[in-house]
Amino acid sequence: MPLIGMASPLYGQLEPSSPSESPNPLVDTTVKPGKMLLFDLEARFAKDVAQRGGAAFADWFAEDGVALGNGVAPVVGRVAIVKSATWTPQSYQLTWTPTDGVMGPSGDIGYTWGHFEGHSKDAAGNPVTTSGRYITIWRKQPDGTWKVALDAGANEPAAAGDCCKLPN
């Protein structure tokens, strides 16, 4: 979810607040199977990134995937994303929660969107937090796996207050 905060070298690490935050079809009977699949992909993607950092982030992209971030050129292709996603989970932690997801009628493409929050430290060791919105477009590959076709993020303005945060 996601390419977040790409203006810094720590962009893109995503981790859900909790895998249990995915919709529960036993509680919400309106959740469609396609949405459940997308939320499951998000949870697995986030868990992998939380454990392995930028290497995992890049692994989830399609060969022709695109990462879009604030104020920087698009990063096009998995090879370029691998070269730019060099952070570790120890240097940057980012949590995100998908708010919604929609599977296309063909069942081979869908998107999720939500809110993210990233945590790192500046050169002086002071905590730095970024937050914003993201969208991830997922595409089923010819081998049946799902990969990120496009990931884009937009940071919230520093003085956004509660305008851009999801209610609890």
Predicted features by range, described:
Residues 1-6:
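Bacterial N-terminal signal peptides
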Residues 10-63, 160-168:
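Short, low-complexity N-terminal intrinsically disordered segments enriched in polar/charged residues
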Residues 13-18, 22, 131-159:
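Short beta-strand edge/turn micro-motifs at domain boundaries
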Residues 14-16, 99-106, 151-157, 165-168:
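Glycine-rich beta-strand-turn "strand-cap" elements at beta-sheet edges
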Residues 29-39, 48, 54-108, 115, ...:
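A solvent-exposed, acidic/Ser-Thr-rich amphipathic alpha-helical stretch
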Residues 108-142, 157-168:
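Exposed beta-sheet edge and beta->alpha loop/turn motif
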